[in-house]
């Protein structure tokens, strides 16, 4: 049972974070297993070249159970566990810190690295039709993508320093801007 809930589902126990987040209508910062708090985010700004966080609709329904099974299988590999600790968690934590501090330059540097790590090590969890698009974002610096949840479909989280440039690069794809700064 997790610290926040024990709702059984097809992939194990629920953390209860999604309902808590919905109830509070605030971002939640998880510092450790026992340190969970509501937090603020930097205020939104209107600039000529607006940075943004967006959702990219994959148009596919992702099934959680196979993605979790794949992840658990990969966790048996020492190299994967090492990458998770030394790259994935490192860049994820840096992105959160940069975002909360408002350090946009560092945020996008770390987001690019995180996007590369996900593409290189979580590729089976990314819908195949998005592999090239994911790489294009990294190579062009127009946008960077990150899996939402277990992957396999649903929404993909996107970050861009220039939303107009990202929209052009993502033409033909359904995106929804959720935050600008």
Locate predicted features.
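C-terminal nucleotide
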Residues: 3-13, 17-150, 157-181
């Amino acid at each position: 049972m997790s610290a926040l809930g024990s709702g059984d589902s097809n992939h194990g126990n629920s953390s209860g974070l999604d309902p808590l987040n919905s109830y509070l209508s605030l971002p939640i910062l998880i510092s450790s297993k026992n340190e969970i708090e509501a937090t603020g985010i930097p205020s939104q700004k209107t600039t000529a070249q607006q940075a943004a966080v967006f959702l990219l609709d994959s148009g596919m329904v992702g099934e959680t159970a196979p993605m979790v099974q794949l992840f658990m299988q990969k966790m048996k590999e020492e190299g994967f566990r090492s990458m998770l600790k030394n790259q994935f968690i490192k860049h994820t934590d840096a992105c959160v810190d940069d975002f909360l501090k408002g350090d946009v330059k560092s945020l996008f540097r770390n987001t690019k690295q995180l996007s590369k790590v996900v593409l290189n090590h979580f590729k089976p969890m990314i819908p195949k039709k998005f592999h090239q698009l994911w790489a294009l974002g990294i190579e062009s610096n127009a946008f960077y993508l990150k899996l939402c949840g277990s992957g396999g479909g649903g929404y993909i989280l996107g970050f861009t320093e220039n939303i107009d440039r990202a929209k052009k690069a993502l033409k033909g794809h359904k995106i929804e801007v959720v935050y600008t700064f």
